[in-house]
Amino acid sequence: MNWEVVKLRLNMALATLGIVLLGFALALAVADYAFGAQFGVGLMLSILMFIFFLNIIQWLFGPYMINWAYRTVEVTPTDPVYGWLYSTVAEVAKYNGFRDVPKVYIADVPFPNAFAYGSPIAGKRIAFTLPILKLLNRDEIMAVAGHELGHLKHRDVELLMAVGLIPALIYYLGWWIFWGGMFGGGGGNGRGNNGGLLFLIGIAMMAVSFVFQLLVLSINRMREAYADVNSALTVPGGKENLQLALAKLTLSMDPGALEKFKKKSTTNQMASMLFFTNAIEEVPTWNARELVEIWKTTKVPWYAEIFMDHPHPAKRIQLLEKVSKY
């Protein structure tokens, strides 16, 4: 049994459950205080239904919008140029127990990235941008595919969409309380002449929703780490090739990253790297290997990734090292 994986799964489960329970408890208590139990619960349910409906629409039709925004072209097994990419994804899909191969797309955008997406009506999909295909070799592409297919296998989109309802619920509840205070109070224990108090509670709730959004980001970082682990455990050579892929992506976006990490700079937010532009197309493998070795011993302070949706690359490298020991 791989205890690092067990620990990661336990942390994800506890964090997700904690955010949901704490968020609902806070919203229910504040709604009761501001509007009374009956109206407060009704308002909460109405808000939840509203944001749930919007999220469902976005989830169902989002893949089509992504294809349009990223100018994607589907790759078929017989494609004379990129047929190898389809066969690569098919091989990784087999390793991960997929019954059908997800649809494979190439995105015509100027930065290196890969992403998995899909919905019940659009099916499972995985896309690679043209720059990442030039930057990485086939083994590294396989490792990246193992990461992305891990998101599909673990249903990360659906889970994060569900958890993301909590900060939205708290924000819109705060918005209602804010305007209730502006017009003289609600209908619960805080009504009457406490419009000013409700006004402040509304502002506080909207601020608290931002804190919950940071907690959701922490869940996202865990899911990204879990996808890394999936690649390491299901793809032959996945650990080493995913490490090299991450280093090459970092160096392509910031050719000076190696020197920065040599100076032990741990505040550079690399997780946003996948959304930069003007990447270089070739990165020497020995530079990537050197950066991986530096990351293995880099100490990352807790606050370095608080606003990031991906773990710090050094943490990703170190987790992959721990997982591979079992």
Swiss-Prot record:
> According to its record, how does it sit in the membrane?
Multi-pass membrane protein
Per UniProt, the cofactor note for this protein states: Binds 1 zinc ion per subunit.
Give the active-site positions. Answer: E148
| Record GO terms (molecular function) | metalloendopeptidase activity; zinc ion binding
Binding, Zn(2+): H147, H151, E224
Instruction: Report the GO terms under cellular component.
Output: plasma membrane
Domain of life of the organism in this record? Archaea
Annotated coiled-coil positions are none
Which CDD domains does the UniProt entry name for this protein? M48B_HtpX_like (cd07338)
This entry's Enzyme Commission designation comes to 3.4.24.-
Q: Which cofactor is essential here?
A: Zn(2+)
The portions of this protein that span the membrane are: 10-30, 41-61, 159-179, 197-217
The family database entries (InterPro entries) matched by this protein are listed as:
HtpX_protease, Pept_M48_protease_HtpX, Peptidase_M48
Q: Which GO terms describe its biological process?
A: proteolysis
Q: Subcellular localization, per the record?
A: Cell membrane
Q: Which UniProt keywords apply?
A: Cell membrane, Hydrolase, Membrane, Metal-binding, Metalloprotease, Protease, Transmembrane, Transmembrane helix, Zinc
Q: Which HAMAP family match?
A: Pept_M48_protease_HtpX
* NCBIfam families, sorted: PRK01265.1
The family classification in the record reads: Belongs to the peptidase M48B family.
Q: What is this protein called?
A: Protease HtpX homolog
